[in-house]
Amino acid sequence: MPDDLFDALGRQAIPTIGQDSGAKLNDHQLGGFDEYVTHSRLRNKNVISPSSIDAETAQLQPLLMRTESLTFLEELVNTPSPTSYETRGQRVWLDYVKKFADETTHDDYGNCVAILNKGGGPRIMLAGHADEIALSVNYIDENGYIWVKRMGGVDAIVSKAQRVTVHNAKGGVLGIIGNPPPHMQKVDGEPKVPKITDLFIDIGCSSRKASEKRVRIGDPITVNQNFEILHKDIAVARAFDNRIGTWSVAETLRLITESKRKLNAEICAVSNTMEEVGLFGARQIAYSLDPDVALVVDVTHATDYPGISKQAHGDIKMGKGPTITHGICNHPEVVKRVEQVAVKSKIPLQHETVSATSGTDTDAVFWTRGGIPSALISLPNRYMHSPVEVVNLKDLEQIPKLMGAFAESINTTDSFSVKI
């Protein structure tokens, strides 16, 4: 990938593994997208975000979460991190978590690690993936329209008529995913379900030459839908999948650090890359760290809204706490310990099962090297892989508490092995 695009997304601002990760992005690297976001916020005065809640609104919409933690979540979600171009989001994560870590590092593909109690044992990996589903520029036609490829599980149906940003070497270009009005859509029989190859982006240019001055083949594209409070503890955004995971592992380090309780284990909080396109980053960093046990955090499907079959997908509700998953990649002894600390800490847990794979980084971690004992903790999420994912922040707050309690429960002699 070209160096100037890496510069624009900030990759070269992150030091190599073993160095302190305190470098800052400069104004040129931040580019035009940040200016676009700022102006968008000013235009949309009805958006409720933790940085703009007045006293009256706060009374109407009480937020239980610590203000700094909520602001961190908002910044993580609002910072574009298209899969395989996660660097800007990784910088946000590192800047926050370094206050609670002994050391922060990253590898060549941008998988970031914050280590607490280095040299302790056993080694625990707490992992969430930093990337989000995205599109990329595939073709520019003679009229300047951009045609795209999918990066991850983008739903073409909900993508139409969305505002997007094409991330170029200078920052970002505003675009619209085109959609003919209903008056002009001819339907014979059943309506046609759109495919990714049907999507085109209008950036306001009328020729290929004009568009090529602004974007190029391979530029990543993300939807412009930022964090908002929907009502009380309910929030909506694109990319809660899986900023809630990277937020959770960072907050776990904070809780452990601030508790000042004795810690035996070495904690490696991980913000890994490229989950949405093959679980690649988790596989890379799990191999490098070689942990004794791993907890993976991701979203799961809430099934508490119309049109979803509980018989097929289980009974998972928002507001009832995170879930623990049973089966396959989830080691029974790790799951048992998670359940025990949840009971002791009075943290509500819901239960779900998998029949083959979980579709998360747990699938990659558990068979890395000789097999790393792992478990999946998930946050119920409505409307996953859409621009309007909805989660309960009270559920989210339970996850770092649960992982922190798990980490603090570990003794130096503990091992996770099936009892035979």
Feature map (PLM): residue ranges:
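Short linear motifs in low-complexity or flexible loops
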Residues: 1-2, 6-16, 21-24, 30, ...
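N-terminal hydrophobic/helix-forming segments and targeting peptides
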Residues: 10, 33, 39-420
